[in-house]
Amino acid sequence: MRLEKDTLGEKYLTDETVYGINTQRAVENFPLSHKKVNLHLIHAMLLVKKAAAKTYENLVEDIEKEKYQAIVAACDELLLKTEEDKSFSQQAEHNRDNQNQAEDNRRGIDALFVTQALQGGAGTSTNMNVNEGIANIA
């Protein structure tokens, strides 16, 4: 277990949990639906965050480049997972083995991106879910 803190207090999260305290609060505060945010949106957000990190990497001193390279690598890892999910889902219609792969991969993705499609705010919870996933992988 790990303890995370924010301005609202503290929460324990399991060591396997990739997201952080803000995402956990969103899960608890917005149990309005059981439909998760569409992976196409998360994929697009990851592309934007990767592009921003690559841009900043070119603007900072060498000592800071390692941080941005870690962010880009984390984005690449998560982008691959979202691409695999989309690919397996399309193939699953034609092949039972691919259905099993799609289900296994989706369970992995569901453990990373847990925010509900219906939530308060302007997507802040989803943005934090993606940010925390990138940060904890980087």
Language-model features: locations:
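Conserved, well-structured ligand/cofactor-binding cores
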Residues: 1-138
